[in-house]
């Protein structure tokens, strides 16, 4: 799984949790 990527409009960016506060994958 990747982390640190930017989320798209559906908060999808990787297989890990997407932080809506920072709009990034954690």
From Swiss-Prot:
On whether Cytoplasm is a keyword of this UniProt record, the answer is no
Q: What is this protein's gene name?
A: E1
Q: What else is known?
A: This peptide corresponds to allele E1k. Has not been merged with other alleles since they may differ due to geographic variation (see strain in PubMed:19606224).
Supply one GO CC term from the record.
Answer: extracellular region
Q: Name one GO molecular function term.
A: toxin activity
Alphabetically list the UniProt keywords. Answer: Disulfide bond, Knottin, Secreted, Toxin
> Where found, per UniProt?
Secreted
Instruction: Write the protein's name.
Output: Conotoxin Eb6.16
Disulfide links within the chain: 7-18, 13-25
Superkingdom of the source species: Eukaryota
Tell what the record comments on domains.
The presence of a 'disulfide through disulfide knot' structurally defines this protein as a knottin. The cysteine framework is VI/VII (C-C-CC-C-C).
| Tissue distribution | Expressed by the venom duct.
- What is stated as this protein's family in its record? Belongs to the conotoxin O1 superfamily.
């Amino acid at each position: 799984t990747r982390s640190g990527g930017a989320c798209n409009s559906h908060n999808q960016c990787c297989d890990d949790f997407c932080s809506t506060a920072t709009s990034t994958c954690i």
